[in-house]
């Protein structure tokens, strides 16, 4: 008996060890986890840490049947959270970031998740230690949903663009034509070509209206026949013709002159007689308006047709004859440039005379040559000169001269031209010259010496006509 009880205790202890830990904290037989779905994980550039943005967060109670089966867990979450699309299950541990989520794809993954939750619950009862479930839609489902949403938006846009035209769904060809781009629509291009042709023909008609001849009337382009275009027009019409009601009125230069030359009179409503008889209204005959320019006329020349129209005469009540209308001439006044009198090419234009005062300029005085003459300077003090012998008088011609003198004898051809000259020596002149020597500068002596040398012809022939000294070769 004791052995059986001990064995039962051992089995009980073993069973206790095998029993999962998460069942210790069960409340009412269910496990509660936090579940987030419908959002997405983003990484803000400021924090650079992933965050779960959007979606809903709910606490889901998982029954015991879903703790070991992945299919049971998915079906329970689908029914509880009312999710209609396939999703992927991931869970986050409390000490991990959102970039470290753990995927749950099999029964073994579910059991591991429950064990982790049991360990956390046994160690701490803080709500933050719970495992968080995250439900993410599959990528194929996301792409399908995106395509479906885009298709729905395009369909709504097309219906919005077409429904205002009042076209029902049964007229699918018309709806398809209207949904095409406007610039690529074939009928739009045909209409544009027709409009260009019409404008070109109108311009040709206007230019040929004034230059066409007055023969059989076939020189210009015919009125109604030239404006018919057998082409496909826009919006389903098989043929189109440019009528005068759809085109603006076109006036040529001749029509403008006719309109300016016509005289319009107000219609006379009544004419009264002297006998106070009954009033008889007389209608006035008016010309047709210019808006009927494209009507069928026997003449194709609009310019001739305008000249042949009858002129209204309000007094007589009858239109004038054709010859009277033809005799009327159109007066054309050309506005030229104003007349400017000019001179003939053979005449000179008369210039206005203006009295001008002559200004006399006085010429500056003509410069005259300046001569420097040495003047003897006399001192206020009377210096008594000592008697000097004539033999000791200083000879002014013995002052050093820049001219080189040589002691070589004269050549025989120059000896006949040398004449000795004698100068009288005056004592008074010598005395004054001696006084001048003490008061004048060396420059005065040099000047006097040069003057005397120039006056002495023999001296100049002897000393100044000698050949220059030989030049020595340069050492460098």
UniProtKB/Swiss-Prot annotation:
What is reported when this gene is inactivated?
No visible phenotype. Double mutants sub/scm poq and qky poq have a stronger pistil twisting than single mutants. The triple mutant qky sub/scm poq has a dramatic pistil twisting phenotype due to defects of valve cell growth anisotropy.
Composition-biased stretches, type Gly residues, lie in 212-222
Q: Name one GO molecular function term.
A: identical protein binding
Main localization of the protein? membrane
Please report a single Pfam family linked to this protein: PB1
Q: Which GO terms describe its cellular component?
A: endomembrane system; intracellular organelle; plasma membrane
Check the record and name the InterPro entries matching this protein: Gynoecium_Dev_Regulator, PB1_dom
Q: Region annotation Disordered: residue ranges?
A: 204-256
What span is annotated as the signal peptide, if there is one? Answer: 1-14
Give a brief account of the tissues where this protein occurs.
Observed in seedlings, roots, shoots, leaves, stems, inflorescence and flowers.
* Low complexity: bias regions: 233-252
Function summary: Collaboratively with SUB and QKY, regulates cell growth anisotropy during gynoecium development, thus linking together cell-cell communication and cellular growth.
Describe, as the record does, how this protein assembles with itself and its partners. Homodimer. Interacts with QKY and SUB/SCM at the plasma membrane.
Output this protein's name.
Answer: Protein PAL OF QUIRKY
């Amino acid at each position: 008996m004791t052995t059986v009880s001990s064995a039962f205790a051992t089995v009980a202890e073993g069973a206790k060890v095998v029993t999962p830990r998460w069942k210790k904290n069960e409340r009412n037989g269910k496990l509660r986890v936090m579940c987030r779905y419908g959002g997405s994980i983003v990484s803000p550039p400021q924090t650079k840490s992933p965050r779960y943005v959007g979606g809903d967060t709910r606490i889901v109670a998982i029954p015991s049947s879903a703790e070991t089966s992945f299919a049971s867990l998915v079906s329970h979450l689908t029914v509880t959270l009312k999710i209609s699309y396939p999703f992927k299950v991931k869970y986050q541990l409390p000490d991990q970031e959102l970039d470290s989520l753990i995927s749950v794809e099999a029964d073994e993954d579910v059991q591991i998740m429950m064990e982790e939750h049991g360990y956390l619950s046994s160690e701490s009862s803080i709500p933050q230690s719970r495992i968080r479930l995250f439900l993410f839609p599959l990528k194929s489902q996301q792409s399908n949903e995106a395509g479906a949403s885009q298709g729905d938006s395009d369909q709504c846009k097309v219906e919005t663009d077409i429904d205002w035209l009042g076209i029902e769904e049964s007229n699918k060809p018309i709806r398809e034509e209207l949904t095409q781009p406007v610039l690529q629509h074939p009928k739009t291009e045909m209409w544009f070509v027709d409009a260009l042709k019409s404008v070109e023909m109108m311009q040709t008609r206007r230019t040929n209206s004034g230059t066409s001849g007055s023969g059989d009337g076939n020189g210009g382009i015919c009125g109604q026949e030239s404006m018919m275009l057998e082409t496909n027009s826009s919006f389903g019409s098989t043929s189109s013709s440019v009528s005068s009601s759809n085109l603006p009125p076109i006036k040529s230069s001749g029509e403008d002159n006719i309109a300016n030359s016509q005289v319009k009179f107000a219609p006379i409503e009544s004419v009264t007689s002297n006998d106070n008889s009954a009033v008889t209204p007389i209608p006035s005959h008016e010309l047709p308006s210019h808006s009927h320019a494209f009507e069928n006329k026997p003449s194709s020349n609009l310019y001739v047709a305008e000249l042949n129209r009858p002129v209204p005469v309000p007094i007589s009540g009858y239109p004038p004859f054709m010859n009277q209308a033809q005799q009327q001439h159109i007066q054309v006044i050309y506005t030229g440039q104003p007349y400017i009198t000019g001179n003939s090419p053979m005449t000179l234009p008369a210039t206005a005379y203006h009295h001008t005062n002559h200004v006399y300029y006085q010429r500056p005085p003509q410069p005259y040559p300046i001569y420097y003459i040495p003047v003897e300077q006399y001192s206020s003090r009377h210096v008594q000169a000592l008697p000097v012998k004539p033999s000791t008088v200083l000879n002014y011609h013995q002052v050093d001269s820049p001219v080189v003198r040589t002691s070589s004898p004269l050549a025989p051809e120059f000896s006949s031209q040398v004449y000795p000259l004698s100068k009288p020596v005056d004592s008074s002149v010598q005395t004054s010259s001696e006084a001048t020597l003490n008061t004048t500068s060396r420059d005065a002596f040099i000047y006097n010496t040069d003057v005397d040398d120039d006056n002495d012809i023999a001296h100049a022939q002897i000393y100044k006509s000698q050949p220059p000294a030989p030049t020595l070769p340069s050492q460098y």
